[in-house]
Amino acid sequence: MERLIPKLIGLYLNLLAVVAPSKAASIGFFLFCRPLRSKLAAHHHAFFDSAEKFCFESGGETIQAYRWGRGPKNVLLVHGWQSHAFRWKKYVEAFDKSRYSVYAIDAPGHGLSTGKTMTVPLYSQAVETLLGRVGELHAAIGHSVGGFTAVY
């Protein structure tokens, strides 16, 4: 059933696009901006517990942020749609924590951040707020919409 519903929604949007493309686009965008929040398992929390965790406010939501390492070079990891900071686990483990401070956030409506809506401008605002706290970046790495957000 979990796989059937997205397929039915896709079929509906494809059929609607034939007769009412603007309406199909509007509904598609509405759905895209409301991600399904995935459940966090014990191994996700164990990884998050290995970080220095902190929260900040952005766009009316509480954003969960993480920091690994205390190095002088700041790196930001920006996840994609319907994901959370755990997706960066292997990357975080690969960084030399004496040389890098590795930051990640859970986007609005994702992971441990609050909210039900996520758009690139909202996500970008959260990234900008974080950068106001941590300062200049050495690098940013993004996946999918996270990559778009990092350069928005």
Model segments located where?
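A short loop-to-beta-strand scaffold at the N-terminal edge of the catalytic core in hydrolase folds
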Residues: 53-67
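Conserved alpha/beta-hydrolase
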Residues: 85, 92-114
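The conserved beta1-alpha1 loop
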Residues: 76-80, 143
